[in-house]
A protein has these predicted regions:
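Short hydrophobic beta-strand element within catalytic cores of glycosyltransferases
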Residues: 326-327, 350-355
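Short N-terminal targeting/anchoring amphipathic segment
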Residues: 103-111, 118-141, 154-157
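A short, active-site helix/loop in glycosyltransferases that binds the activated sugar's phosphate group
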Residues: 167-168, 177-221, 228
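A short helix/loop element that forms part of the nucleotide-sugar donor recognition site in Leloir-type
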Residues: 232-245, 393
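A charged, aromatic-enriched C-terminal amphipathic alpha-helix characteristic of glycosyltransferases
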Residues: 375-379, 389-422
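Glycosyltransferase donor-sugar binding loop
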Residues: 68-70, 255, 279-294, 310
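Conserved donor-binding/catalytic core segment of Leloir-type glycosyltransferases
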Residues: 245-262, 268-271, 281
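Nucleotide-activated donor-binding/catalytic signature segment of Leloir-type glycosyltransferases, i.e.
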Residues: 292-319
Length: 423
């Protein structure tokens, strides 16, 4: 029987909900792994889920902490419904700022305060052996000034947005020499933070850059391949039948959390100017701005697009990647890795990719499809035409770089790497 405990801490004003069972006492006597992720939008809830799965595989009891607004999120409901004493969830909101306290100088400080608050509240109720932060970029650059938010508790963080080194390793990114130099210095200080056991990164070039000038007494820096759920291509004819798609049409897929940064606006404008355009599939939950844009422009597209503005199930995701002819990765201002790129590779689909960041680096190095030098309608149109007529290229021996890099991007490999650092 599931029980919900609601506790209001008088001093902090925190509302904490912890899902538990009648048999929870024995489990709670063990030392838990604490996973803190305040935001369950986009891909972040997936990382929290995968880390919990890894803990379960290894027999580590764990607790996910997120903000109260996420009580109705599918992951929160899933954990609650499973009713497992070794898989707990708690909800903690940021502390309301007292009127007499100055505001935090930046977002890094604000998030550091939140993570420290979570650790303080949870450790009053439960012994914690290790903290795992799926997205350490929330507060990473505050560490040289504020220290660890977790006291003496050892912890592991995953960085997804460390881009200051990209110019040094041949990745196209904004040229900000002063900002990059400052962040490089802060990075070297941050990895010496007390309690930080390992900094994992989804960028394979960061450990390489760090090894050039290793920091004394710093945490280990290790590459963890950005995973995507382990799926394999279905028969495209059957996938199209299930989706109600035309077996003779060409389809270009835009997948994931659909925002302006996906380059969706530029893509739609380019498609309206393109003769013999493929049918656009936009699959994933849209933000308000994108939803408004699509509503106003959907009639200008010919053929009419398929718009799935909703959470995409694993089965539908598999059908979408199986049925499409190419995948759009012409993102804007995104310099990190993309799970969508991994999935396109896994399903053998060419991509139309930005030249920026890790998406461009992987796409060029692994020969995944046309690379966009810009997001003009002309460039996009040429790339779409090339993709639909010339890709994938005639089968050749797979480049060793492609096999070595992208074959590691599996959920199993992610869990294995994580558990090696948690042991």
């Amino acid at each position: 029987m599931l029980t919900l405990f609601s506790q209001r801490h008088a001093r902090s004003g925190a509302r904490v909900l912890i899902s538990a069972t009648q048999m929870v006492t024995d489990a709670m006597e063990q030392d838990y792994v604490l996973i803190v992720e305040p935001n369950l939008t986009g891909h972040r809830w997936r990382y929290a889920e995968w880390i919990m799965q890894a803990c379960a595989d290894a027999g580590y009891p764990c607790m996910l902490v997120t903000e109260c607004a996420n009580e109705d999120h599918r992951l929160a409901r899933q954990i609650t419904a499973a009713n497992r004493p070794d898989q707990q969830i708690a909800f903690v909101d940021p502390e309301e700022r007292p009127r007499n306290r100055l505001p935090d100088p930046n977002e890094y400080w604000r998030f550091h305060r939140y993570f420290k608050r979570v650790h303080t509240i949870i450790t009053r109720m439960q012994s914690i052996r290790l903290v795992v932060v799926p997205y350490v970029d929330y507060f990473f650059y505050s560490l040289p000034f504020l220290g660890s938010p977790f006291g003496k508790t050892p912890w592991i963080g995953i960085t997804m947005r460390s881009t200051f080194h990209h110019h040094k390793v041949g990745i196209k990114a904004p040229d900000r020499p002063v900002v990059n130099a400052i962040k490089a210095l802060l990075f070297k200080r941050a990895i010496r933070t007390t309690g930080l056991r390992t900094l994992l990164t989804i960028d394979p070039t960061l450990p390489e850059w760090s090894a050039r000038s290793p920091s004394k007494h710093g945490a280990a820096i290790a590459y963890v391949a950005d995973p995507f759920p382990d799926e394999h291509a279905e028969n495209p004819v059957l996938a199209r039948e299930r989706l109600g798609l035309d077996p003779g049409q060409r389809y270009l897929l835009v997948y994931g959390a659909i925002t302006e940064r996906k380059g969706i606006y530029e893509l739609v404008h380019a498609l309206t100017r393109l003769e013999h355009a493929p049918t656009l599939i936009v699959a994933g939950e849209q933000d308000a701005g994108t939803r408004h844009f699509m509503r106003n422009h959907v009639r200008s597209l010919n053929p009419a697009p398929l718009v799935l503005d909703a959470f995409i199930s694993n089965d539908m995701e598999r059908d979408l990647f199986s049925a499409c002819d190419a995948v759009w990765l012409g993102y804007k201002g995104h310099y990190g890795m993309s799970g969508v790129l991994v999935q396109a590779y896994r399903f053998g689909k060419p991509v139309i990719a930005t030249e920026d960041g890790l998406i461009g680096w992987f796409s060029r190095r692994c020969e995944l499809g046309p690379i966009l030098s810009d997001l003009s309608s002309a460039s996009i149109g040429r790339a779409i035409t090339e993709t639909m007529t010339s890709w994938p290229h005639t089968a050749q021996a797979m480049p060793s770089a492609r096999e070595d890099l992208l074959s590691r991007h599996t959920l199993g490999q992610f869990k294995q790497t994580l558990l090696q650092q948690m042991a």
